[in-house]
Amino acid sequence: MRKVIHIGLPKLSEEELIEIGDIAQRVIIDYIFEHLAKSEVRDMEVTARINQGETLDLELEVYVEVPIFVRVDVESLIDEAIDKAYEVVERHLRKLAKGKGNEGREEAEEASGKSK
């Protein structure tokens, strides 16, 4: 079971959303190739879909095809790679939320005439 964690994100720009998808894809690909040689992977497809409404939804879809002689539980490997990607993306989003939160606080302090 997965629980939902409210990070309290500000509105993200298109570039930030693209970066999140890129990070997730890169983590998955790196994880797969940490466990399999490139020659053992016949085909791989990693898709990230991001929807930002009231919440930020990230859907990751991974397909990996290996030859029959490669002894690996592909489904478990994919699940582990996806879990790792979600962990990395969550850390990245927390940094974004913290950074933007601090920027907003600094702007508010400057507007009110207070400084650190």
From Swiss-Prot:
<dbReference type="InterPro" id="IPR035954">
    <property type="entry name" value="MTH677-like_sf"/>
</dbReference>
<dbReference type="InterPro" id="IPR024502">
    <property type="entry name" value="DUF3194"/>
</dbReference>
<feature type="region of interest" description="Disordered">
    <location>
        <begin position="97"/>
        <end position="116"/>
    </location>
</feature>
<feature type="compositionally biased region" description="Basic and acidic residues">
    <location>
        <begin position="100"/>
        <end position="116"/>
    </location>
</feature>
<dbReference type="Pfam" id="PF11419">
    <property type="entry name" value="DUF3194"/>
</dbReference>
<protein>
    <recommendedName>
        <fullName>Uncharacterized protein PH0533</fullName>
    </recommendedName>
</protein>
<comment type="similarity">
    <text>Belongs to the UPF0440 family.</text>
</comment>
